[in-house]
Amino acid sequence: MITLEDYGFCKKGEGKDYVKNGRIEVGGELPVNTHGGLLSQAHIEGMLHVTEAVKQLRGNEVEPERQVKNAKTGIVSGHGGSLCMHASLILGAL
């Protein structure tokens, strides 16, 4: 939620309300962690986040229930250390 606030998708302190009611689920306004994040599939520390974003942008390489319809832009972000480093990658569909 803090990252969504920091990226400007919602105002500071409004992250909790922003994610309610499925807004960040696969069929929502802003799908987040469509592959489950670090709890499910990110064992290569971030690389699987990149491959997931590319697959989503290609539009035909993930299971139908996880596919974001008409995905045009993907943001991959990650933290390192004790939240002392951060990296972001913005990808776009061709």
Protein language model regions, located:
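Claisen-condensing/thiolase-fold acyl-transfer catalytic domains that form or cleave C-C bonds
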Residues: M1-L94
